[in-house]
Amino acid sequence: MTIDRTALAAKADALLAAHRSGDPLVLVNAWDAWSARVVAESPGCEAIATASHSIAAAHGYPDGEQIPVTEMIEAIRLIAAVVDLPVTADLEAGYGDAGSTVSAAIEGGAVGGNLEDRLRPAEEHAGAVAAARAAGEAAGIHFVINARTDEYLLGGKDLDRAIAAGRTYLEAGADCIFVPGAGTRQDVAALVRAFDGRLSLIGSPKSLPLDQLAMLGVARISVGPGSLGMAAAALRDGAAQLLSRGAFPETMAYRPPGA
């Protein structure tokens, strides 16, 4: 696959510009070319994000870098090939070599990515962030780094520790700090202030609603495997209707453009 570096750089710049504190970039995560097309045709869609959990599940693997990096990159490539929007990829913890993984993701058409710390020492993960930044510069693009601290997801939900980690990652070259699990108004507001608005969160039925997160100044909101959950629930309900000898659902006729 030949990469148009100029077009890729423009997409990277557009992705970065879409991170707006108070008017957040909303990402409905995709896991294959089909789901990416469905999301891309939705009004207001500015970018496509992948979800590692969903891609792994679709390939029969558990989450957590159990899917080989080559298969993950191929899934990213297939997604980027069918949409004209910027693609930001969930690169888990970088597969042991964040620089090489980011370089491969860029070759696959991604212009941004998540890198999670899994509670590694902040200085260690900052090295991965710096390697990702260097990989983007070597490719001639501003690779948009969404650096994740797992303090709320896997740790003790310590606000000060999350802030310290996030600031370390920003200093290392991250563009936004992803804090999954941070859910109270007070904590979200504190994180927004600490990161000068460069806060990324994951939304769910249990989180604060989108409009409140926007009012608090969040810059980016994704749904992770939640979009796969929506699709699976629709398939489950349709299957139950058919297997009970019910009517053929009208939604069976839907096809995304180009599919």
What are these regions (language model features)?
Residues 234-235, 239-241, 258-259:
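Ligand-binding clefts/hinges and TM-proximal coupling segments of bilobed small-molecule sensing domains
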Residues 249-259:
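A short, charged, Gly/Pro-tolerant segment at domain boundaries
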